């Protein structure tokens, strides 16, 4: 009973094999697979020399093979080897033992077939291999090409590190609750900003890839994208984004100065002060409206100068400058309209206005949808400013359009004058041609009775001149009639005394002229009186 309960003890050959395997495996990693396999074969051959410990040697050989398969993945890539080996948690009857010879595979397959297996000398001699057995080829082992870059855990880590390094970062300046700058040009990942400030990925997408003005209200933040400012407002923090990596511009510097002044100002004890987020919001809107006014003044002055010059002289260069300035004014008007619409959309959303009280939310105070008087008055004041800027820009655009139409009309009138002059010359040329026609008749070498008279030359010349003048007079008269511009084809006909005039219903004059309406009223009254007289008679 005691012999059956004793655990098997490792033999010297097993210990020698493990020592040899550890030395050779760590000495050369490139040939580690062949070395380990050869050591495994030697271990099996030595373990078969003693018949008394055959069962123990078989169990230990199985353990050696398991240890070999455990060491190999640590030296090489893990996935291709483990892909070819079965799971260690499977029962022994379903395991495919790793071996480099066909005889060994046959030995283990024979062992699977019979549960009461008793090894014989023939099965032990199979480990030595046959004489005609082919040598081990490189194709029998896993190929190095199978160990791709994606199968290595180190390469996966490198890929993740590269993705993390290539993740876009946002530069920002942070201001604390006291108006002090605590971070200048700090870099944050988008994931960090999303996790830290409770935002959504689409919110940051509107910051870094959208140029349209937006005012987004979130449960714990206010996100603004207005012209040159991209700001995140918390109940005690303000972040000014600079995603393009450019240097600090003058409008942003002026905004930071104004923001610090508004956040650091102290109100009197009796006066109620605005919350932190509203003071920051007011600084943003002030900077945006100031920038709009500065841009409008920069555009308005050259436009007015060009318009005044075009009144005196219409030049090609001035018209070209007017075209360029009109495009700039149209772009500015569109930009101002977008800012006004963004503020107007926020004013129409009562729930967003109520959610803008971030400081009260930190104290678990929530307002109703209609209780937002302070922020509504603040936004309405700046909405009026932006609307005035939009109206002024619209007036400037309409002035440019009117000037263009007037210039076009003047150019058309000049073109018509040139065409009229051309027609006059054509009429004069026609008259001279008719006079020379008569002179050409007498240029033929034919005999006539006028040649022998003394008055022939004077008569023919006089007739030619008179005929030319008649043709010119007729042509100029027709041209003068064509030159007149009339609103109607036919003038008002003359009305004889005692004859009533009934305007044509098809003409606009009969409906719009006050005199005609009064005449119609009198005629109707006369008809009514005459009908009454007939009744009395």
Curated annotation (Swiss-Prot):
Region annotation Disordered: where it falls in the sequence: 79-112
Transit peptide: 1-26
Entry annotated with the keyword Repeat: no
GO molecular function annotations of the record: magnesium ion transmembrane transporter activity
Protein name as annotated: Mitochondrial inner membrane magnesium transporter MRS2
Subcellular location, record wording: Mitochondrion inner membrane
Family: Belongs to the CorA metal ion transporter (MIT) (TC 1.A.35) family.
Primary subcellular site in the record, as a coarse category: mitochondrion
